[in-house]
Amino acid sequence: DGNSIYFSNNKNEFYSIDVKTGTTNWRNEINSTITPILIKNLIFTVSEEGYLYVMEKNEGNVIRISNLFMNYKKKIRKNLKPIGFAIGNLNLYLTNSNGDIIVSDLNSGSILNKKKIGNNLISRPFIYNNSLFVVRNGSIVKYN
C-alpha cells in the first residue's frame, strides 16, 4: 500500500512492517508461504493448513478465518499444501499441491467449487482481462 509491507516469515508469524522506519506495525500467528493480497483495507492470505485469513491492514485484526480444505479427508489434508491464489469477481481461486483449484466466495468464505485441473505441477492462478489462467504441465490454460 506504499506505507507498509506484509509478509510471513514461515515461522508462524505474519507481519506488517512500516516501510519508512522498518518498525513492526503488528504481528499475527499465521503460517503461510504464499504471497498475500491487499484489497483496499483488507489483507487476504492462506495458511499452510488451508485456512483463508481476512485481516484489517492497519491493526492486523483478524476479521474471518475460513477452512478452505474442509472438504478433504484428514489423510489428504495432512499432505496438501496451497500453491497460490488470485482474487477476482468476488471469488478467491486457490490452487493446491494435488492439482485441485478451490473457488471460494470472498464475502462469506464458503466454498463454491473444487475441481481437479492437473497433476501436482500447477502454478498459482493468474487473472487477466477477466479470465483465469493456470500453468499446468508446462502449458498455459485459460478458464472462463
Protein language model annotation of sequence segments:
Residues 18-21, 56-59, 105-109, 144:
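Short loop/turn segments that connect beta-strands within beta-propeller blades
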Residues 96, 103-144:
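Hydrophilic extracytoplasmic domains
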Residues 46, 53, 61, 66-67, ...:
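Loop/turn-rich, solvent-exposed surfaces of beta-rich toroidal or solenoidal domains
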Residues 2, 11, 49, 98, ...:
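Surface-exposed loop/turn positions within WD40 beta-propeller blades
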Residues 4-7, 43-45, 53, 91-94, ...:
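Conserved beta-propeller blade signature
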Residues 1-2, 9, 20-40, 64-87, ...:
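Extracytoplasmic beta-rich repeat domains
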Residues 15, 53, 102, 141-142:
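WD40 beta-propeller blade core
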Residues 38-58:
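Generic detector of contiguous secondary-structure segments
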